Amino acid sequence: MSKTPLTEAVSAADSQGRFLSSTELQVAFGRFRQATSGLQAAKSLTDNAQRLIDGAANAFYSKFPYTTTTPGANFASTAQGKAKCSRDIGYYLRMVTYCLVAGGTGPIDEYLIAGIDEINRSFDLSPSWYVEALKYIKANHGLSGDAASEANSYIDYAINALS
């Protein structure tokens, strides 16, 4: 079992033969509210994924128009290139939804950051392209309140990792 502040509090209380304190219970309720917001955000992003991906790709093409005219397998000058671009944007969006469900940055840390520099160099991809796509998603996801705060924190984390 992975350690979290909640599992550590339970373990400490159990080893001391006591019930959780009111402070520890408040932390648990706070985590529950955060988890609920994260799950709401993940569901909304998933339900709107195609719209967000398409819009992010168009924002990407507008900011970096050379990507749609430069020939090559790693550019969006062909239908296949545009499909790859959308696939990659979808990958970043999926990582954000995984973080929202997990309640931490682990999915981005393990699946995105770990090899992103090597992948981008190998395939001549610019991280700034995906930063622009993530900025579009953040500005257009349609979330509000705690769900928006949760989603934005992981989107910002991914943007910072790529910057």
Curated annotation (Swiss-Prot):
Record's Pfam families? Phycobilisome
- List the CDD domains: PC-PEC_alpha
**Entry-linked SUPFAM superfamilies:** Globin-like (SSF46458)
Predominant location: membrane
| Post-translational modification, as annotated | Contains one covalently linked phycocyanobilin chromophore.
Q: Which residues bind (2R,3E)-phycocyanobilin?
A: C85
Q: Where in the cell is it found?
A: Cellular thylakoid membrane
Annotated GO biological processes are: photosynthesis
Q: Which InterPro entries match?
A: Globin-like_sf, Phycobilisome_asu/bsu, Phycobilisome_asu/bsu_sf, Phycocyanin_a
Q: How does it sit in the membrane?
A: Peripheral membrane protein
Q: Supply one GO CC term from the record.
A: plasma membrane-derived thylakoid membrane
Keywords, A to Z?
Antenna complex, Bile pigment, Chromophore, Electron transport, Membrane, Photosynthesis, Phycobilisome, Thylakoid, Transport
Subunit and partners: Heterodimer of an alpha and a beta subunit, which further assembles into trimers and the trimers into hexamers.
Q: Which PANTHER family does the annotation name?
A: C-PHYCOCYANIN ALPHA SUBUNIT, PHYCOBILISOME 32.1 KDA LINKER POLYPEPTIDE, PHYCOCYANIN-ASSOCIATED, ROD 2-RELATED
Biological role stated in the UniProt entry: Light-harvesting photosynthetic bile pigment-protein from the phycobiliprotein complex (phycobilisome, PBS). Phycocyanin is the major phycobiliprotein in the PBS rod.
Family according to the record: Belongs to the phycobiliprotein family.
- Protein name per UniProt: C-phycocyanin alpha subunit
